[in-house]
């Protein structure tokens, strides 16, 4: 039976880089954001309900979702954000569960769930939580470098996410990503050895019961 570790962290913490390090070691990897993207891609099963709730203005003339328009709309309105989440979260949950069922032989796998702290229903899918942490200034710098957003825009996104202290309270394990990619790989390798050991001998190890 494959046991699942939920990998989470704030924007710019290095979640995807850490998840890729695990994948490079042969660990099964599931990405909640990738699942969400597939659900809203061309012919994605979430599109009809999104169109019904948000109208044609969030779609282009080819019927493709205008993600930038939808993102601005939900970012500016908590009620619209909740409406979108009412559509997407159950579908993402089901997609992750479906993907998990395709893995049975590995000792453990990684599920990358950025909003795990905010959306606790996903905890039922995992056994243990790994939080990727990084100093705030490093996080802001990373996001600015890759996205072109201003410092103020990045800070606004961070302010809408769970706090670092909230993520740390949920965590079984914490990986501090405050250095180079080489350092991140080394820390990931140590965690891989740890997880491989505990899940081989004690598959229920952890405070979560997914």
Curated annotation (Swiss-Prot):
Any matching Pfam family: CoaE
Functional pathway: Cofactor biosynthesis; coenzyme A biosynthesis; CoA from (R)-pantothenate: step 5/5
Swiss-Prot/TrEMBL catalytic activity: 3'-dephospho-CoA + ATP = ADP + CoA + H(+)
Domain DPCK: 4-202
Catalytic class of the enzyme: transferase
Sequence positions that bind ATP: 12-17
Localization (cell): Cytoplasm
Annotated GO biological process: coenzyme A biosynthetic process
The entry's keywords: ATP-binding, Coenzyme A biosynthesis, Cytoplasm, Kinase, Nucleotide-binding, Transferase
Gene Ontology molecular function: any one: ATP binding
E.C. number: 2.7.1.24
Cellular compartments per GO CC: cytoplasm
Similarity field: Belongs to the CoaE family.
HAMAP family cross-referenced by the UniProt entry: Dephospho_CoA_kinase
PANTHER family reported in the protein's UniProt record: BIFUNCTIONAL COENZYME A SYNTHASE-RELATED, DEPHOSPHO-COA KINASE-RELATED
Function: Catalyzes the phosphorylation of the 3'-hydroxyl group of dephosphocoenzyme A to form coenzyme A.
Record protein name field: Dephospho-CoA kinase
Source organism: Neisseria meningitidis serogroup A / serotype 4A (strain DSM 15465 / Z2491)
